[in-house]
Amino acid sequence: MKKFLLAGLIAAGAGSVMAEEAPATADTVQTNLNIVWTLIAGILVFTMQAGFALVETGFTRAKNAANIMMKNIMDFAVGSLGFYILGAALMFGASKAAGWLGWGGLGMPSLSGGEGFWDWTFFFFQTMFAATAATIVSGAVAERIEFKSYLIYSILVSAIVYPISGHWMWGSLAGEGSQGWIEALGFHDFAGSTVVHSVGGWIALAGAIALGPRIGKYRHDGKANPIPGHSLVLGTLGVLLLWIGWFGFNPGSYTAGIGSIGRVAMTTNLAACAGTIAALVTAWVVMGKPDLTMALNGSLAGLVAITASCDQVTCNAAVVIGLVAGVLVVLSVFFFDKIHIDDPVGAVSVHCVNGVWGTLAVGLFAAPASLGYGNDLVGLFYGGGFKYLGVQLVGVGMTAVWAFGMGFAIFMTLKKAGILRVSAKTELKGLDVTEHGQDAYASFQFFSNM
């Protein structure tokens, strides 16, 4: 009897609570859906940190594996705090100086008149992007940069360099009063081919130049010595993780649970597949062998290239963008080797070169409203003329000047201070033991002539 009485009281209480609650409106349901989807997308983007760590570790030597892992986890940790304390305000605060700078006070600026669920969700998602821009550089400076210098770089990029250029192109994501000067021209970069990847790629180029090549990379006759990574298995797993993460990176950039996310996921995947195949074929022709590392970088190149236009192009255009990216990444790797810029993982070729290509591709392939796309500007190949391409070129050019210039200034300052590059003895022995007193593979013995 007591059990039935208790059940009745619970049912009555639940009924009264339900009676007091107002029914959810369509707007409330959509807002909650947007929050859930954006959080899921942000978590997917976070998995890209693991992808980058595995790619960089696999493409470099075993004696530096722990150092690579340490750099990747620490650039996320210090970068997230730097973006929270200062970067978010610079990127999404109210526009100052005609859209050249944002400011909303230290800490996370408010988007809704006070801290709310959407504010937290939005800035969680954007923090993942800031961390991605910072970690791109790790591979290009691998096996020779001092750990403390890398920490300094990570803080400066996440707190200052990335947010300032990000405001120019994405400031209005926080509201109309935050519009940057480049986006006011009509510039379009949906998920960050330039805002994220080119920024990281240009800084990676600056770092590789400032550091110089690894010991033994180039012979006296100018030809490059191959320095193979120790695990193509780790590298492949890393690329697959990045590929998965990109389904949060691109579709998640709507920050809304709407039907268009399916189209963006489709164009993203097609470009990645096309990039993989194009890089494989190009490397096969040039090198005489179907090279796995080139195919893997082709996947990433296709993903980077489609990131700017994934919401504005057709599936056929996505394939073309990916094919071009796959060819470019292979030719770019050989080009940088030819001019003695040592990039152990091909970060500059993947993120800088194809970030530029992907951003310009918006001005070529942006589809018109007649095909179901609500674009204000139409690409050159659809009769839109050169205006859109010109606007995209402005964004690419200004980002190159800012990111490369600031990156080079940071790395050269560290070099002048004598803390940028490890000693030759440390480099030859490996950074795991010398920098961290640890060995990533303590139970294994590796044989190497370098």
Locations of regions flagged by a protein language model:
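Glycine- and aromatic-enriched membrane alpha-helices
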Residues: 19-450
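N-terminal secretory/membrane targeting signals
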Residues: 1-20
